[in-house]
């Protein structure tokens, strides 16, 4: 057998082995939070777009929610606007909010839409302001030290939390064979804009759609134990225990809480996925080779 024919045979074998997985997910909705290194490398960006198009082609319904923190930071720096963070959240005054909307809704969103469409998909870019897709309210942040008798309320500007998702719009797009690509900008009761963490938006979208899976692309191999070993499969109870004993802490806490709440809210499973791995999404859904940490009501087989 020639090398060319051997390569073709291997490709056919892989496609054949993927059939049971394709059947499992046909007609199901998967919400993917896209961010980190996967958005910065040209090779990974192209791979992501092709993976999304392939999912749609075999009958799976991907819904993409994207971040864009580094891009926002870059433009703020070029405009000589200082960035401030409190508890990992960007303090968002009116001027910063204008930049957030410009970058997320105008630049990053349209770049992703264009890339997916160039590879044969039919992506539609949205922000939470379109048809009030993401209804939001101002996020209240409090802080208390032992010396305080009352918690201090900290104003971090136009940072919001999700209070509702327009599922009618998303279902209409999905049934029309479109791929929604969502920028995490919410709209308040009076039309005001809110900057919302993309992980949180993805989790709430997954809950609202009763998605089969929430996939959070990150820059790490997955959730690790205290010895640095990746934990490939966890139940919701085990996640609670790891938070309580301090294994999960710091910057991973909000992401893990988001994944946990999604499963508790009716999503089939959540996945902390290594976005640095080429075709990570396909490896997860079409093979037994996990590339991250699965959180569900039962262990990964």
Swiss-Prot record:
Keywords: Amino-acid biosynthesis, Arginine biosynthesis, ATP-binding, Cytoplasm, Kinase, Nucleotide-binding, Transferase. Its EC number is 2.7.2.8. One of its GO terms (biological process) is arginine biosynthetic process via ornithine. Gene3D superfamilies: Acetylglutamate kinase-like (3.40.1160.10). Disulfide bonds: none annotated. It is found in: Cytoplasm. This is Acetylglutamate kinase. The lineage of its organism: Bacteria, Pseudomonadati, Pseudomonadota, Gammaproteobacteria, Pseudomonadales.
